[in-house]
Amino acid sequence: MNSNFHRFERILRPVLIAVLLGACSTTVNWNYPRVPSNAFTYPETTTVDALFQEASDKHPGLSGFSLVQHGENAFLARLAMADLAEKTLDAQYYIWDSDTTGRILASRIMRAADRGVRVRILIDDNYQTGDKDFVIAALDGHPNIEIRLFNPVRNRLWRTLSFLAEFGRVNHRMHNKLFVMDNAVGMVGGRNIGDVYFGVRADHNYRDLDVLTTGPIVGEISASFDMFWNSEWAIPVGATVKELPTEKDRKGMLKRLEENVNAAGYPYPIYESPDELRSRLVQIRDNFIWAPGSVLVEHPSRVNTEAEIGVIHKALSQRLSEVEREILIESPYFVLPERRSREYSTHRERH
């Protein structure tokens, strides 16, 4: 951030705040009640965990990993996890589009909640535009579903002005992407939820990579979710609407959701029987690579700090200093400041 922008921000912020405070619009209730919660603690009691147990016993202390490259397989795996979940589903995403893919997955998650599965969904607020607050508040009205927004702008109707007034805070976004079932199976990677990420749009060709995993590392993935979920920056969606949707609103929203899903065409089959779903997971299990693994995640408190060097950078620098032959990295973005570029070039020249 250059100094000119900081000067501009300091001059403009008081004006923007005055405008926003004077506007008759919905603002976030930061004192909205929040109840802490954590991941399911007994994944070994679930049916899906039993599918992996024999293979896991042969690789004590290791986790199973499977790379999921194609969009179709990535989406079907998420649907299988939603359909087979028995205890919990945790989802954390930067973007959850309200297109066909977003509605289909939301519908399957609703079915899981109807079966008694506890659902927690954490979405970054950056793309919560229009009437999305009311829509997800209606979904949040389900007794087994709770949705929170990460680091929301205070003023919901004057988002652009609010963003400028609070730039120092709201410029810190949550790009984490994970989907965890019963704390037994997890999926992490580069895909958000939307048509463009799963091979549905003919005019887009996004190339992303997911990792489906089981074993000890799933507990680490869940712990990272809990850290963000229980942070002061994760705000219940009910805090973002002036009036909570009624039960009639919720039922009407869910009916339209189901109708839209049923009416939507899709380029590949998305409905499978329970036996077919289990067979899909067994096939993945039989191709697992068993290895040690670790989860690296920035702490949500970075929203309130200007620290340049975070957990990820420190870990990457450490790995680079230890590498003997090669290091493989796949990332949709690899943008480095000049100082970091020189550092990594030094490691490359050393070998």
Which role fits each region the language model picked out?
Residues 13-23:
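Bacterial N-terminal signal peptides
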Residues 1-15:
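Short, low-complexity, charge-dense intrinsically disordered segments
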Residues 24-175, 181-351:
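Charged, low-complexity intrinsically disordered terminal segments
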